Amino acid sequence: MADAGIPDEILYSDISDDEIIIDGDGDSSGDEDDDDGGLTRQAAARIVTDLGFEVLQPLQSGSEGRVFVARRPGEADTVVLKVGQKPSTLMEGMLLQRLSHDNVMRMKQMLARGPATCLVLPHFRCDLYSYLTMRDGPLDMRDAGCVIRAVLRGLAYLHGMRIMHRDVKAENIFLEDVDTVCLGDLGAARCNVAAPNFYGLAGTIETNAPEVLARDRYDTKVDVWGAGVVLFETLAYPKTITGGDEPAINGEMHLIDLIRALGVHPEEFPPDTRLRSEFVRYAGTHRQPYTQYARVARLGLPETGAFLIYKMLTFDPVRRPSADEILNFGMWTV
């Protein structure tokens, strides 16, 4: 657990500079003062106050709105308020109203003030990225298994409702401890996903699945890939899946780095896709197809963890197991 004296701005990590939301014609990223259609942090704080809350601490804003730790005067419990005036904030709130699962963020309330929507959310101790940073070391297999199993349970629930999260990463996984884990931030989620299609670019480059980066058709299996990257990061911290220390320049460069780092074999590329036609030339034959990735094998990770990472990071999404299928693997002991 994190030290109780650590302030929230440390317990909650920054939004990645490489977060992308490009769905249709929109494009949002970063934390500029007008990144929510002109809703400044000061204006959002006034909305929070007008709604009867006391702002305790601003958190790093994302592409979908301003975020604060707050509480109602006279109440001890704190909450996280997400304030935005883009349609996506309202849509996220409407989606959260439909959800009820222990491993998916439960919205307490949705409020409106003029054109702005305010989501009242639980205040967790920290996010997984910050938890790993404060530990300054990887988790053991027991703790990593607890975290990723909870994430997979949340994903299985969402996928059963035909909801695709599209931004599974350590920053969007919230916890009190490794036994109390919740998947949050559904601002990039897509509903009514019945079959693979190109639903636009969304999420974060470093955790995007290859089919997203290649702009191919995709479905809920992209969330399994993101969870696989998270599992790698929890077991191999501070190493990254590509071995690079700098953020990806763009999606295509990250995809090339990924193919090379994992040692993806040409036979593992899905047929009749842009992924194969445009990127198979970066593959190698030094590794047998459908065996453990070179990048993972070199690190000496726990055998169970290495197996799960390989399955979740199966390059061809058709071969990649679903969250439900992984949860039914016989190796779970946590």
Curated annotation (Swiss-Prot):
SMART domains: S_TKc (SM00220). InterPro entries: CDK, Kinase-like_dom_sf, Prot_kinase_dom, Ser/Thr_kinase_AS. The active site is at D167. Pfam families: Pkinase (PF00069). Keywords: ATP-binding, Kinase, Nucleotide-binding, Serine/threonine-protein kinase, Transferase. GO terms for biological process: regulation of G2/M transition of mitotic cell cycle; regulation of gene expression; signal transduction. GO terms for molecular function: ATP binding; cyclin binding; cyclin-dependent protein serine/threonine kinase activity; protein serine kinase activity. ATP binds at L59, Q60, S61, G62, S63, E64, G65, R66, V67, K82. GO terms for cellular component: cyclin-dependent protein kinase holoenzyme complex. It catalyses: L-seryl-[protein] + ATP = O-phospho-L-seryl-[protein] + ADP + H(+); L-threonyl-[protein] + ATP = O-phospho-L-threonyl-[protein] + ADP + H(+). Residues 53-333 form the Protein kinase domain. Its EC number is 2.7.11.1. Able to phosphorylate in vitro the major virion phosphoprotein phosphorylated in vivo. Belongs to the protein kinase superfamily. Ser/Thr protein kinase family. This is Serine/threonine-protein kinase. It comes from Suid herpesvirus 1 (strain Kaplan) (SuHV-1).
